[in-house]
Every structure is written in C-alpha cells, then in structure tokens.
C-alpha cells in the first residue's frame, strides 16, 4: 500500500523511518516548499510533489501522514477525509473544537481510520498504568480505585519558531501538555472540568536556529483536571526544562504506579498487599529502550492494511482531548 507524507520538515525523517519498517508500504512525500520536498525525496529516493491538491487526488494513495504545523492540520485532514484517505496526523488534531467535530463526523461517515500521534499510549510502561487504572475493566483493579494522579512533561523547546508563537498554535499546551492530557483521558475517561493554576510565559526571548527571537506563547502551564469519575488530576507541562523530563504518578487505594519513558527515572508498581501478578512491596518496571513512534506507525499501518477499526488512539479519543483543551482555554 502507498502512504503519502505531507510535510517535509524536521519531523519527516522519523515518519519516513517509521513507515520504512513496513515491508508492504511505499512512501511518497509532499511539501508546498519545493526545495524541501525535493531534498527529502532525493535523500530517501522517494517520489515527491509540491502540489497538495494533486497529491491528495492520487488514487494510488491509501492513506496520508500529516506532519505539518498545527495551524494547517484542520484543512489538510479534512481534505484527506473528503478524498477518502485514511490519515495519521501529528498532535494535536487541530486548533478549534468545531473543526475536530467536523473531522470526526467525516471519518465516521466514510468509515475511515483517523489516528492522531499521541505516542505515549504505545509505551509499555504506560500500558501498565492503563491496565492498573481499570477504566476498561473496573472490577479488575489489583490496587483498587485511583485516588490521585499527577503528570509532568518538560523540555527546552527552541526547535522551531512557530512552536513558540500563539498565531501558529504553539506553546506548552499544544506541544507538551496534550500528550499527558491524552494519557490521563486514556487512564481515567473524559474531563469534566478544568482549573488553570498557572499559565505563564517565562522566556519571551528565545535563541532558535542561531537567531534571537521574541515569542508570545505560554511556556509553563499547570492545571487541575476533574475527570468524569471525580478523580482530580494535576498536569504540569513546560518548554523551559533544559533536559527533557517526564513522568506519571498515580496513587491507588492499595498502592502506587510510577512510570516514565526515561530509563533513568524510576518506574514501578508498589502494592501494600499481594494482588494478581504484583507481590507486596515494589515491583520495578523495566522495558529498555523502545522506539514508540515505530510502534505507533506499525499499529496505524496494520489497521489500514486490514481495514480494521482502531481500538487505541481513536478519533473519538482525540475529540475528547480537544474538548478538554477547549475547557482549558476558556479559563
């Protein structure tokens, strides 16, 4: 099958590598910047185009992979849906809640597969946390019901100017917090209400690509989310942490879960008493280094290949994230 990548910026390499692991997948690339499209096409010996309309009209394309700035997502995704193409799109799905609902309706109407890149769902350590949360099987909670949870993700930013500008939907919320918000929704269900504790711009001057630039999007945010079941969840995200930092901590009635994609962070399950596969005390969680993006793309390709509805990272999951973001931005 043939999958078309739209967007030949810095993320293109990882998308091409992820698709390249699938033996039956042929990749083509497109970017409105002719030089970028040509450079990536020639670098990886792939067919390339700088005409998005012609690219989407190509009947040989089974699906498209959208790796462009957030501001462009709604238009490109909807055009892909109208063309009858399955799609993978970098997070977040789009900028406005109305667009996300329109996309969702189109996906359902045409029976398409639409996946958004919330890659943390494909981390084995966070799969453990999801199982413990018991959202899917409430009666199978070895540690009991969740009592409190906190999520953190921080990075330095400074990769591209648009990621720090409000007009292009940049900032710590869209770039960082959405990942942890999606995990929280996967663990505990939809968000009922939001309270912003802090939303700040701490570094208005950035050094990006060798140039000092003024930016205006928030780079630090802390918010409290009340989930549908009443659980209170704290999420902190920023673009001011020099060395990337990420973890999830959930307290249950009879134990704790601590997880991170970073091998130098402690990941474990603590149980106050023996329960299912967990003995009393601390059980370390060690999975080594895993390419989450490749796992995610393999899942997308499998579902497209077999015309099989998604069970994880569904379009409805992405809509729930967008609904929570709408509540957050109304604060």
Model segments located where?
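Hydrophobic residues in well-ordered beta-strands that form the structural core
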Residues: 50, 89, 114-116, 150, ...
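C-terminal helix-rich "cap/oligomerization" subdomain common to oxidoreductases
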Residues: 5, 24, 63-66, 101, ...
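Beta-loop-alpha module in the N-terminal Rossmann-like domain of NAD(P)-dependent dehydrogenases
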Residues: 15, 44-106, 118
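Contiguous beta-strand/loop segments that form the cofactor/metal-binding neighborhood of enzyme cores
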Residues: 182-265, 297-309
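Active-site loop of classical SDR/Rossmann-like NAD(P)-dependent oxidoreductases
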Residues: 32, 284-298, 313
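Predominantly a Rossmann-like dinucleotide-binding segment in NAD(P)-dependent oxidoreductases
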Residues: 120-213
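N-terminal Rossmann-like dinucleotide-binding module
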Residues: 1-44
